[in-house]
Structure formats: structure tokens, C-alpha cells
Amino acid sequence: MHRIHLYNNLERRKDVSIPVYQCICDRWKRGDSVRLLARETGRSVHEVQRMVADHQTHLLYDGVERIIDRMHQSILHQDLSLPPIVYHEKADPSSHKMRTIGVESIEQQLYDEVADYALQPLKKRIGTYQIACLKGKGGAMGNRALRRWMRDKRVRWAVQADVKKCYESIDRKKLMGFLRHVVKGSPRVLWLIETLISTHRHGLNIGCKLSQDLVNIYLSVLYHQLTEQVAVVQKRRGETKKHMAVCHALFQMDDILLLCTSKRDAKLAVKALLEKSAELGITIKPSWRMYELNDPSVRGEGKTFVDIIGVRFYRHRRSLRRRVYIRARRGLAKVQRLIRMHKRVPSSLAKRVISHVGCLLWTEHFRLWKKYKVTKTLRVCKEVISHESKILYPAGHR
């Protein structure tokens, strides 16, 4: 395995200042950031809020510089003290699953940003179609790729699997062993990462940016194993031919999709998936599926489909999942009703509709688009969000 030099051992002050400013500039209005800057600058919370509202954040840079100095010294001396993470249970609005979310202090979020910035060279290991939580990728990239792959008639079999408790099941010892194996030098970066993830209750913390990138980097081992190492050798009439068992792979964080040309290749891919995941210390749910895309027992062309990233991909069309479609239709109808009654559209409803319209852009639901005047509805919702973002809330507001 090729080792990567990070070129950033957090020795220089700018290795800390650049990510800290990137993090703070995205969080000026947040209550925890306001309280931290008020404490560092000796001002009141109300004064800091007023400076942010008047776009005078340059007056707070002296407090940011003090934070950077303190963080840099704590990293150099490897002496880190952080407030405990606060955990709470939250129901996932789409799947209704209960998830344990850890809310980190703003200080730990800054250290996460520093560690994540130092890991930039290691992110090159992440596979091309590992699309979750990565800038420039996401559902749009996965949608374009799957639309292209499904039109290829050579792709006949699909394998779908899911990692059980992806964040919480990550073995921190194996993760750090992997990082020490692939990272050349940079002991301070490894110490900082190990110290930060040791504060998590089980495995890695859900809702932490550093956790997202560490999971993507760790699962890249599985991605490259399946797409580059699982080969099929065919011998016929004295000729030897070799091809990869997996012709296309898509990882949406813990959701795995493998596309193959034959049932034999699909079985080989499943075997490699289960073996490599066990080696990495992660568990694949027993509900994994292997199915034929051109199933002759299903009448009609295009009746079999791939269901991932909230969209059903048929051979020559795409549609939303039923429950997503119903929610999108209800949200659009509610906004249309409020517009006709000349009533205010709540910001929560506007955000939900904008999200659903983003999914509709990937599909061929033209009748829905025309019936609910989606273009006009989207413009109204964007105006609501734009107005909402200009309101300055108190420091403790959520």
C-alpha cells in the first residue's frame, strides 16, 4: 500500500490559522461562536452580535488570533483539554430511525477542522464514486453516473448492501492502525486525531466533520479492493482473458451498490465484500440483496430497478421513491394553498420543499412539475429562506 506524506505536521502557526478562520467564518452567527468570541475579546454577547450584524467581524479578529495561539501551543505540547460531548437521541425524519447525535463544543469543532485540514492529501485515496459528504460529489454525481450505467445493457446484475451502524461500529484501534500504516511521518496529526476520536462514546461521532472524512478514507480500502482487486480469469481455447468482477461501484457513505455483468461475478463480489469488511472490523447487514436487472420473470421492460439515494433507477427513466414522492407532492400542495390564501410560508416548509425540488430535478415527473407550478413555488420558497437568513437571532437561539 502506497504511503502518503501529509506535508503538514502542525508545526507552523499557519497550519492552524487557515482552518480556524475557515471554520469561524462559516459560524459567525451561531450562539456558541458568539459566546466564545465574547469570552476571548472581553465584550458582551450583545456587542459581538451587533458587530456580526453590521458586518464588522474584522473587529473580532484579535479574539480569533488568541484562539489560534492557544490551540497551536496545545498541539505543540500535546496537551489538549476539551469539554465533554453532549449526546441526545434524534429521530431521522426520512427513515424514522433513532440516532444518537453528539453535539461537540465549538472548541472541539475547531480542532476537528485543523485535523481535517491536515488530512487533505490523504483524501486522494477516496474512490471516485464515494459520493457522500464530499464537495463536488453528492447525490447529483451519483445520479448522473447511475443513469449512464443503467443504460449499459451489459450490466445485468446488482448487489446492494449496507454497513451496520457505520459510525458507531468503526474500531478506533484498527482505524488508527490503518492511518499509521498509510501516513508517512506527521506524528502530531496522528496524535491529534487519536485524541479527538477518543472523546467519542462509541466508534466515531455522528455529526462530526472529521468523522465523515475518516469513514470515507477507511471505507476507501473496501472500495479499491472491490473495483481493482477482485478479478475473474477465463480460459477458453488456449486464450486467457481477465476482467474485473465489479464493473461499477457506488458508495453513499454506508450504502454500497455493486453492478456486475453476470451472476458469477456478482457472487464473487459479494464474497469479497463480506471477507474484506470482516477484515476491517465492520459488519454488513444480513439483508444484503443480489438481483437481476433484466429479470425474465418480471413482465414488461424496465420493471426491475435500483433503489438508492432516494431515487428509483430504471433502464430508461428515473422516479422518486413512493414515500419521497408523496412528501414532495404534499409539500408543494401546501405551499400552493398558502400562496393562494396570501399567507406566509413557514421557513421549515420552504426548506423542505426546496430539498424535494432538488430531488425532482433528477427525475421525469413532468406532470407533477406542471400541476404544482414548481418553478413559481421554488422562487417563493427561496425568497422566504433569503429573508429568514437576514434575521439576527439571540445567541442561544436554535
Predicted regions and their residues:
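Beta-rich nucleic-acid/ligand-interaction surfaces
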Residues: 133-142, 249, 290-298
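Active-site-proximal segment of RNA-dependent polymerases
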Residues: 111-171
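Non-catalytic, polymerase-adjacent accessory regions of viral genome-replication enzymes
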Residues: 1-73, 389-398
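Right-hand nucleic-acid polymerase module
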Residues: 109, 113, 224, 231-240, ...
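Conserved polymerase palm-domain catalytic core
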Residues: 74-75, 148-274, 292, 305
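Inter-domain linker/hinge segments that demarcate the starts of reverse transcriptase
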Residues: 67-79, 266-281, 328
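Short, conserved non-catalytic motifs in the polymerase core
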Residues: 53-55, 83-110, 126-137, 197-217, ...
